[in-house]
Design a protein with these regions (language model features):
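N-terminal secretory signal peptides that target proteins for export/translocation
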Residues: 1-12
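Bacterial N-terminal signal peptides
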Residues: 19-29
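Hydrophobic alpha-helical segments, especially transmembrane helices
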Residues: 15-16
Length: 255
């Protein structure tokens, strides 16, 4: 008699059964990951696509492109590489129009977007490290979960913008306007915020270690559970309750 035929089929072990769902979850995670998330980035061939209003250039390699003065309102450039894009940083040049642009989860490292119009743009989840945004218009823009470390945005208006959960460390936003902005859980550590305006802004749980708030206006801001106030610089700062830091022993903590 063939002994092999009498053997019971091998049952899967408990460990094997438990591993199957885990393998499935890992596969789903890989399948859902953005193109290029593992290994080198993969982009579409966009060589025949003209840069124009509402153009679809998502997942395109546009690094080092010059877009000074172009009207690109509503452009769709999510998941694209826009590193070192030159939108101009000369006030004598025409402004680049990116109003309402969709540039989510993109790479904009070291891009020059001074004076650019980015009002109502969706930039959430993008890497904007080292971006030049001086005098750019970012009113109502969505910058939640962005990385802005080292970026410079002196005198730029961010009125009613969403910067929740953004990381903006060791940057410059002196003279910028964040009135009415959602800044909850933002990481501002080490950033220059002199003369910035935060009237009515949401700064709950913000990380403010080492920030410079000299001459800043925090009237009506909500900074409940904000951290790092002990190491922040306050001088002639209008505190959330309307008092002046100089009258509070050089601090706005508790005010």
């Amino acid at each position: 008699m063939n002994i092999e035929l009498l053997r019971r089929p091998t049952r899967p072990t408990r460990r094997g059964l438990l591993a199957l769902p885990l393998i499935g979850l890992l596969w789903m995670g890989v399948a859902a990951a953005p193109v290029g998330a593992a290994g080198s980035p993969t982009y579409r061939d966009c060589s025949q696509i003209a840069l124009a209003p509402n153009a679809d250039v998502h997942r395109c390699d546009l690094s080092d492109a010059t877009i000074i003065g172009l009207d690109l309102h509503g452009i769709y450039a999510s998941w694209s590489d826009l590193s070192r894009v030159n939108g101009g940083c000369d006030p004598d040049l025409p402004r680049t129009n990116l109003a309402g642009a969709r540039i989510a989860r993109a790479i904009l490292v070291d891009a020059k977007l001074c004076d650019a119009i980015l009002s109502d743009a969706d930039l959430h989840g993008s890497d904007m490290s080292g971006v030049a945004l001086e005098d750019a218009s970012l009113n109502r823009a969505n910058l939640s979960w962005t990385i802005l470390s080292g970026s410079q945005a002196a005198f730029a208006p961010f009125v009613d913008a969403n910067l929740s959960n953004a990381t903006w460390r060791d940057g410059f936003a002196n003279g910028a306007t964040f009135d009415g902005a959602d800044l909850h859980r933002i990481d501002f550590r080490g950033t220059d915020l002199r003369s910035a305006s935060f009237v009515g802004s949401d700064l709950r749980y913000a990380r403010l270690n080492g920030v410079d708030l000299t001459d800043a206006d925090l009237t009506g801001a909500n900074w409940r559970q904000a951290t790092g106030l002990a190491s922040a610089t306050f001088s002639n700062t209008i505190c959330p309750d309307g008092t002046n830091s100089d009258a509070n022993g050089g601090t706005c903590a508790g005010h």
